[in-house]
Amino acid sequence: MIVIFLGPPGAGKGTQGKKIAKKIDLPHIAVGDIFRTIIKTSTSEAELINNYVKQGALIPNEIVNQVIKIFLLSSQYKNGYILDGYPRNLEQARFFESFIKKAQIKIIYFDVADELLIKRVLGRYSCKNCGKIYNVHFLQPKTDYVCDVCSSNVFDYRRDDNEEVIKKRIEVYKTETYPLIDYYKNSGNFYIVNASKDEQEIENDIQKILKIN
């Protein structure tokens, strides 16, 4: 099974991707995490990508496509995966379908209001050890400064997240991705979830779509 999670930054794709992947025993591939890892390297490619991220602009298709193709054609993903953050536009979708059959794909779109997106993104942080995602407004650890999952007390706050950049990312996302939504609507494998709901309700809705018990 190949599942694509579509939605703007802050829609909850990463949180749900990890949870659903664990339930159906498939890897969760977060494109944003892949590129943040690349940015930490001391390469000219990392510097180039980092410049796009700081401006809130999308990384060019040719860079994204080649990086993702290398990942997806790895043998560890031969049985399927949950793909979070790709494709982002029609060009990427068509490139994706050049090596993945469209009939194998289920697409789930996370629909959520802009105001809530901004609040979610500005408030989110994660455990540096296990990657568990938290939010200062909606989801804090049960014990202050201690991760619920691994008990680490080291957290990672996204330095590229500020309100101006987030607003630009949302607008860029709409311009680039809305035509992709129309493209997938006619596929017969396109579903919409109300991502303004709480975390458990969203998970339940996705499980129904994927027919997970």
Curated annotation (Swiss-Prot):
GO terms for cellular component: cytoplasm. Residues 30-59 are annotated as: NMP. Keywords: ATP-binding, Cytoplasm, Kinase, Metal-binding, Nucleotide biosynthesis, Nucleotide-binding, Transferase, Zinc. It holds the Pfam family ADK_lid. Pathway: Purine metabolism; AMP biosynthesis via salvage pathway; AMP from ADP: step 1/1. It catalyses: AMP + ATP = 2 ADP. Catalyzes the reversible transfer of the terminal phosphate group between ATP and AMP. Plays an important role in cellular energy homeostasis and in adenine nucleotide metabolism. This is Adenylate kinase. It comes from Rickettsia typhi (strain ATCC VR-144 / Wilmington). The lineage of its organism: Bacteria, Pseudomonadati, Pseudomonadota, Alphaproteobacteria, Rickettsiales.
